[in-house]
Design a protein with these regions (language model features):
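Subset of Sec-pathway N-terminal targeting signals
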Residues: 1-18
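Intrinsically disordered regions, especially transient/low-confidence alpha-helical propensity segments
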Residues: 4, 202, 281-283
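Short extracytoplasmic/periplasmic juxtamembrane "stem" segments immediately C-terminal to an N-terminal membrane anchor
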Residues: 14-35
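Soluble non-transmembrane domains of integral membrane proteins
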Residues: 38-279
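Short, membrane-interfacial amphipathic segments enriched in basic
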Residues: 277-289
Length: 289
């Protein structure tokens, strides 16, 4: 029994050391390439040039139960496995290169003066939600879109060791989920997407379902969306939507996207969006509430 305790303690120490090593190697600071936004629940890293949210951490859920541990990541990357997962939005048909126009700890306003488009990323009044507003002064011929871009691989920061809950983590379901007027909950593993999946719907949502925490792009009752999940291209699976019927005289001027990045708490998900609680119905459960 003593040997088992000693071995468990050694494994725990290794896990903690590995976490702090990863913090040091993957640490991103605000500079000419990135802006960091922060509130009580989330820390976000935004790529200035693309406007993508390239990392998110849940501050109230540390990876290790020790002082100095950082929160679990939903979006992020791993140099060891080349894994990447990020959020991107904008207008189809154009590829802006942004600069910072305004920034504070809880929002950033980016603009591309040449194309006349801007993007504001800010925290919503709803916990664990981010508002992303894309706009164009002159109008854009493309559609508004928002998407999750994910390479193949297991979710970041989950324990994999057998004595750390790794058996449940490794067997938990991971895949794209879409909720629409046609079907409240359809899912597909990424590797099984060999042709585009599309559905038109008012409101609804699209998400990548994973254990404990996940990201979802939530639609509005005021718009019709073409939800999609696409086969792997250039190393990434893409899941998201385009906003349909939004153009005025064939031009689109703006849209605000609603992005949830948070824990799987059933009561919260029920109140947040219709059918969003179904994202916790697959695999093993770990109740946070």
């Amino acid at each position: 029994m003593g040997l088992l305790y000693e071995w468990n303690s050694d494994q725990k120490s290794k896990s903690i050391n590995k976490h702090f090593d990863s913090i040091n190697s993957l640490s991103i600071e605000s500079n000419e390439d990135f802006v960091i936004l922060e509130n009580d629940e989330l820390t976000l890293v935004v790529s200035i040039s693309s406007g993508s949210i390239v990392e998110s951490r849940l501050k109230k859920y540390p990876v290790e139960n020790v002082d100095g541990s950082m929160g679990f990541r939903v979006f992020g990357f791993s140099d060891a496995t080349s894994f990447k997962y990020y959020f991107k939005s904008g207008f189809t048909g154009i590829s802006p290169s942004f600069i910072v126009k305004e920034a504070d700890s809880n929002y950033v306003l980016l603009e591309d003066p040449t194309l006349g488009v801007s993007k504001k990323i800010s925290f919503s009044s709803n916990p664990y939600e981010v508002a992303v507003y894309d706009s164009s002064l002159r109008g854009v011929e493309g559609k508004s879109y928002a998407g999750l871009y994910r390479s193949q691989g297991r979710s970041l920061d989950l324990k994999r060791g057998a004595l750390e809950g790794g058996m449940m983590n490794n067997s938990s379901y991971e895949g794209v989920a879409i909720s629409s007027e046609l079907d409240p909950y359809t899912t597909s593993r990424l590797a099984s997407i060999d042709e585009p999946l599309e559905v038109l719907s008012r409101s609804g949502w699209v998400a990548f379902v994973q254990k404990y925490f996940f990201a979802a792009i939530i639609g509005s009752d005021d718009y019709i969306y073409n939800y999609y999940a696409l086969p792997k291209e250039s190393g990434f699976y893409r899941m998201g939507y385009t906003v349909e019927g939004l153009s005025l005289n064939n031009f689109t001027y703006g849209h605000e996207h609603r992005l949830f990045i948070g824990p799987k708490i059933r009561k919260d998900l029920i109140e947040r969006a219709q059918n969003l609680e179904l994202a916790i119905d697959m695999g093993w459960f770990w109740f946070l509430a």
